[in-house]
Amino acid sequence: MVTQLKSASEYDSALASGDKLVVVDFFATWCGPCKMIAPMIEKFAEQYSDAAFYKLDVDEVSDVAQKAEVSSMPTLIFYKGGKEVTRVVGANPAAIKQAIASNV
């Protein structure tokens, strides 16, 4: 399951998941590629239960998107121990799966 983060404090709490891989999908409701990739991210969340999956609307929580230096959507940022380990920009399922598999 992919949980939506609705505030900076929810985002900070999500990143404090210890050594667990945290995947945050930065999206926008008006973004076509974001809508296209969303079902794949849900599928990855089911496949990789050792990771925590979140999504964040860049228009609702713009301060977090700015802080994370997100300028294109979708951008998926992968965190471990609260620190970014990699990111995938664009609706690229193969790159997203590779990033998850190599960091779980």
Curated annotation (Swiss-Prot):
There is a cross-link at residues 67, 97 (Glycyl lysine isopeptide (Lys-Gly) (interchain with G-Cter in ubiquitin)). It is found in: Cytoplasm; Golgi apparatus membrane; Nucleus. The record marks 32-33 as: Contributes to redox potential value. Pfam families: Thioredoxin. The active site is at 31 (nucleophile), 34 (nucleophile). Coiled coil: none annotated. GO terms for cellular component: cytoplasm; cytosol; fungal-type vacuole; Golgi membrane; membrane fusion priming complex; nucleus. Present with 17237 molecules/cell in log phase SD medium. Yeast has two cytoplasmic thioredoxins, TRX1 and TRX2, and one mitochondrial, TRX3. Participates as a hydrogen donor in redox reactions through the reversible oxidation of its active center dithiol to a disulfide, accompanied by the transfer of 2 electrons and 2 protons. It is involved in many cellular processes, including deoxyribonucleotide synthesis, repair of oxidatively damaged proteins, protein folding, sulfur metabolism, and redox homeostasis. Thioredoxin-dependent enzymes include phosphoadenosine-phosphosulfate reductase MET16, alkyl-hydroperoxide reductase DOT5, thioredoxin peroxidases TSA1 and TSA2, alkyl hydroperoxide reductase AHP1, and peroxiredoxin HYR1. This is Thioredoxin-2. It comes from Saccharomyces cerevisiae (strain ATCC 204508 / S288c) (Baker's yeast).
